[in-house]
Amino acid sequence: MGKYAISYDIGTTGVKTCIFELGDTIKLVSAASEGYNLYVFPDGGAEQEPQEWWDAMCSTTRKVLDKCDVDVNDICGISFCSQMQGLVLVDKDGKHVRRAFSYMDQRATEELKKGIAYGPQIAGAN
């Protein structure tokens, strides 16, 4: 009976899920990936649907567990890495209220320029 960790790489184009056996060395036991949509708009918008992230995580979790004989009770760790600088707006219950803004979204370039030019001035930073 070994010890295992499950890891999730939640990227821009999809999620990659792996189960690793932990010991003197770390051994890949099972892996699966699944893509999801990136909605790109003519005005520079780039958005993603958070529910698609969750659905892909659930699906790949089932796939990696189905492909190996690891007992879920032997999974002693979980690891996440993900895309950065996205924005998910949520309500008071933590539910997303719209698609997430991707870090690739370019719709606020004018606001960014104004913020840098007229926002708080930090010595040496701007």
Model-derived features: positions:
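Glycine-rich phosphate-binding/catalytic subdomain of phosphoryl-transfer
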Residues: 42-45, 59-126
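Short glycine-rich, Thr/Ser-proximal phosphate-binding strand/loop in the N-terminal lobe
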Residues: 5, 10-50, 95-103
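Nucleotide-sugar donor-binding/catalytic module of glycosyltransferases
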Residues: 53
